[in-house]
Swiss-Prot record:
One Pfam family named in its UniProt record: UDPGT
Family label: Belongs to the UDP-glycosyltransferase family.
CDD domains: GT1_Gtf-like
Protein name: UDP-glycosyltransferase 76F1
The protein's Enzyme Commission number: 2.4.1.-
Residues reported in the UniProt entry to bind UDP-alpha-D-glucose: 275, 334-336, 351-359, 373-376
Amino acid sequence: MEERKGRRIIMFPLPFPGHFNPMIELAGIFHHRGFSVTILHTSYNFPDPSRHPHFTFRTISHNKEGEEDPLSQSETSSMDLIVLVRRLKQRYAEPFRKSVAAEVGGGETVCCLVSDAIWGKNTEVVAEEIGVRRVVLRTGGASSFCAFAAFPLLRDKGYLPIQDSRLDEPVTELPPLKVKDLPVMETNEPEELYRVVNDMVEGAKSSSGVIWNTFEDLERLSLMNCSSKLQVPFFPIGPFHKYSEDPTPKTENKEDTDWLDKQDPQSVVYASFGSLAAIEEKEFLEIAWGLRNSERPFLWVVRPGSVRGTEWLESLPLGFMENIGDKGKIVKWANQLEVLAHPAIGAFWTHCGWNSTLESICEGVPMICTSCFTDQHVNARYIVDVWRVGMLLERSKMEKKEIEKVLRSVMMEKGDGLRERSLKLKERADFCLSKDGSSSKYLDKLVSHVLSFDSYAFAS
């Protein structure tokens, strides 16, 4: 641990697990390099500060005692995700400004603000008004950002909005993507999606730099493309989660680990579809039967509420789990880093969220790719066609026989070298964090960049 530099970094994550987790990992990286860190977080989805004792947490809220939260959990439970992002940006804009002003005027030198890219130009306005430099964190990959940045072109060329008749056509401007791989999602307000994406891209262009949770050897061409488009300093210092000096924390419930310990090496399919994705009951049942019929041991994470219309496992046929016995295990949550690192894991059936993609790459685990929305589609295409460490299982083909076929193919490999390529990619990920690796060098540049910012004080 380096000595405190007497300088503070303010961080503003988007309040979703897939965005908060990499931001808190980045906070740990800065803390290890001697910076103090303050996390400004919305009262919506506010985390448990006791889990992160090295950082100062501030709740962003303009509530007076007894007033309703500006964005209640009940209000957002059934809300269109794009509409939710818009509400977050609208309702927390002024509380955010007041919070940053209070922090900058608090005495300790504030080096910069690090904000999630999706907050967009909202944070730029505040940073300029208060007089603090702003650096953007892109929690997703560079490849998907290139696709987002191309939205105006894609609309001009007629790729967007997506037409069902063109799903399998190649997007010649963004190889190897097909039309169905473009990072869109179902929304009642498609124009709002375009506005959110444009605001994210323009906010990155006007920043003092972009931090990427990726590594150069994985996305070199995409990073070069992004650098050319954005024309700001860029720092691909990932994978963030590999910087931690502490071993992966063990779960309080040892049942998962004990079960994995009893399985043969590389024999288990681990299935988990992220913190936001929801599936229909029919899909859930096809997954269940596909896993069972594959005759491979499986560990399946099913979040409560992730199957529409049910609380958890009520849809399973009577006696299903008893019939599986010790060959399969369904849980509400699993320590994913711990699971992927276990020698029993032979494949990861994933929604292809960026954090999950990186975690699987870092453990050399081949992937079965079932993307759900936005950047997950791009990630899946790169996993399958560029890095060649996975197989595609599209949601439109979620039928038990197809599931069984793909699971067997990945686990048996059929000579296609999935596992060998996965292990080679793992080696490249390991090297990037070594002393001479690209991520380590970019981290040194990032620290120097942040320290080069002039000292700013809040002028009232």
